[in-house]
Amino acid sequence: LQILDLGQIPLLAKDRTEDDPLVIGGGCCTYNPEPMADFFDLFYMGEGEISFYELFDLYKKMRAEGKTRHEFLHEASKVPGIYVPSLYEVTYKEDGTIASFEPIYEDVPKTIQKQIVLNMTEAVYPEKPVVPFIKATQDRVVLEIQRGCIRGCRFCQAGMVYRPVREKNVEHLKELAYKMLKSTGHEEISLSS
């Protein structure tokens, strides 16, 4: 929220105009997006790589056609894994839990299915990551080797959220590592999972 404030972007999605950027949420926090729903225009439910290009192409098309922000958000809600809070009526019980969750338009999905990348080797991954102009603490390439965890500890949200375990092909990882080192000038690789 501080980033929005510093960027002079209205904090509440309902207060944003056609001139304001879209505020999109994703990652682990989207498994319970309601506490932050008033601040976001839309959320990716699950892993964003699945619907990123479809959403981006829709955005470009609708901008070219002169469509409004609301019209875009309405159409975006039909992209698998996209949750647009402004298109749902949510009521709460006295204890703060959700009593009902209903779309306000008939063509908006009643439920949003989280999206999962099943083949990590085919998943989009930056071969030429942005390199900061200043000295960074993590002055190395970050290479994602897998998602998921075989343990599934009950206290660990990430271990449960990113199931099932999915690994990238070793040859593909070698190719990515070479390209990323060459394009960034870094000399070290941090393996991420």
Question: How would you label these PLM feature ranges?
Answer:
Residues 15-17, 74-76, 115, 135, ...:
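A generic structural signal for short, solvent-exposed coil/turn residues
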Residues 84-89, 93-140:
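Ferredoxin-type iron-sulfur electron-transfer modules and their immediate structural context
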Residues 1-103:
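Glycine-rich beta-alpha loop elements in corrinoid/cobalamin-binding modules
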Residues 7-12, 18, 105-112, 119-121, ...:
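Generic detector of short, locally flexible boundary/turn motifs and exposed helical patches
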Residues 118-193:
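Radical SAM [4Fe-4S] cluster-binding motif and immediate context
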Residues 65-66, 111-115, 166-167:
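Short, exposed beta-strand "edge-strand" segments with a Pro/Gly-rich flavor and a Y/T-containing core
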Residues 18, 25, 34-37, 64, ...:
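Generic, low-specificity signal for short hydrophobic/alpha-helical stretches with a mild N-terminal bias
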